[in-house]
Regions:
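A short SAM/SAH-binding and catalytic strip from SAM-dependent methyltransferases
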Residues: 186-198
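A short acidic, Gly/Pro-enriched loop at the edge of an enzyme's catalytic core
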Residues: 177-187
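Class I SAM-dependent methyltransferase SAM/SAH-binding core
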Residues: 136-176
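Conserved SAM-binding loop of SAM-dependent methyltransferases across substrates and taxa
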Residues: 127-139
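A short glycine-rich, Lys/Arg-flanked "PGG" loop and its adjoining helix->strand segment in the class I
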Residues: 200-215
Length: 243
């Protein structure tokens, strides 16, 4: 805790913080490793079964308490112009955060195979970076942006009105009970599924929201071998506390 507090106070050089992060990650991975492959499979099956028994999201209000209900002025100070509250993309020719946000928004559209004229659901829309980008760049698309944060939805609605975007709707909803009207050509969810538990239940519902040729595009953090949830297991669990 002393080391983390010192780092957060800005007293440690970058190389030392990087070394500390690597050390913490190695410790985390050692705690997840299981040398017996059969035991590892049993553990994975038990993990999946536990997720299937619960709700889609355990505490949907918790992220709001942690950071989503922080005033947008804070995020305007630390994020790029688009307020993209998820990872950016840094090709070699990109040197600033605004351009990195644009690069990632464009890549998401390419991989989700967005076409003008589609009806699109942005599930877990954050501060509306992708929804607003779609509404601006694909004027024939009709976009529904969904967040469980009223503050975020109000912000997106105000920005859409300021930009005179008539093809963007915003809805505040709890993912446990959310049921949209109509069908969608694309459902896109960027860095929301990490916070969920019962993926199977939500994906089954999402299947009923798709048009006959519709597709779902998911972008989420994961490890190639280990399954885990975002938990705050202790005072030194930086990722659990802040993500």
């Amino acid at each position: 805790m002393i080391g983390i507090g010192t780092a957060e106070a800005g007293y440690l050089p970058d190389w030392m913080i990087r070394r500390g992060i690597r050390w913490m990650l190695q410790n985390r991975l050692r705690g997840l490793e299981e040398p017996d492959p059969e035991a590892a499979q049993r553990g994975l099956a038990a993990f999946i079964d536990e997720l299937r028994q619960g709700p889609v999201a355990l505490k949907p209000e918790l992220p709001n308490e942690q950071h989503y209900e922080v005033a947008p002025e804070f995020f305007e100070a630390v994020l790029g112009r688009r307020l993209k509250y998820s990872c950016a993309l840094w090709p070699e020719d990109v040197a600033d955060l605004d351009a990195a946000e644009e690069s990632m928004l464009s890549l998401t559209c390419d991989r989700a195979k967005i076409q003008d004229g589609m009806r699109v659901l942005d599930l877990g829309c954050g501060w509306g970076a992708w929804s607003l980008w779609i509404a601006e760049n694909y004027p024939g698309c009709r976009v529904l942006a969904v967040s469980n944060s009223k503050l975020q939805c109000d912000f997106i609605g105000a920005r859409a009105a300021r930009l005179e975007l008539g093809n963007l709707e915003v809805e505040t909803a709890d993912v446990n009970s959310f049921e949209p009207e109509g069908l969608f050509d694309r459902i896109v969810s960027v860095e929301m599924f990490e916070h969920l538990r019962n993926w199977e239940a939500l994906l089954a519902r999402m299947a009923h929201w798709l048009a006959p040729d519709g597709k779902v595009f998911l972008h989420f953090f994961c490890h190639r071998e280990h399954a885990y949830t975002y938990n705050t297991e202790g005072k030194d669990d930086w990722m659990g506390r802040h993500f």
